[in-house]
């Protein structure tokens, strides 16, 4: 698990890949302000939990496809990865897949946007 302070440090130093597991619209802030403020935690990337599932078969995509999605987002097996979403549910899906792919230093920010967006002192990006 990761908390607000770890996420804040991670987005400031850039050594940790922080992944938003919400939809692209929610990541960009165009899907409404479900958590108080629209957008995402600053300096984070988007790997939506729903995109890990093949829409035709309704099962997880192949390991190679999943690995490519996370690698293209900047996840590195040698570094810490923190997943977040609205309240930890979608992020748990991303963390589960990362673990299956061999990532060993994975955490979920369980308070996620429910906490972050409610604190106007914490940085967010839109668009």
Model-inferred region functions:
Residues 1-17, 21-127:
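Rhodanese-like catalytic fold shared by cysteine-dependent sulfurtransferases
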């Amino acid at each position: 698990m990761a908390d607000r302070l770890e996420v804040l440090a991670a987005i400031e130093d850039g050594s940790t890949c922080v992944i938003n597991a919400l939809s692209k619209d929610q990541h960009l802030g165009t899907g409404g302000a479900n958590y108080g403020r629209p957008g995402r935690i600053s300096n984070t990337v988007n790997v939506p939990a729903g995109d890990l599932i093949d829409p035709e078969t309704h099962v997880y995509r192949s390991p190679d496809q999943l690995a490519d999605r996370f690698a293209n987002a900047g996840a590195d097996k040698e570094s810490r990865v923190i997943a977040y979403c609205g309240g930890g549910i979608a992020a748990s899906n991303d963390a589960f897949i990362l673990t299956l792919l061999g990532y060993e230093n994975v955490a979920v920010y369980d308070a996620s946007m429910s906490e972050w967006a409610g604190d106007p002192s914490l940085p967010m990006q839109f668009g």
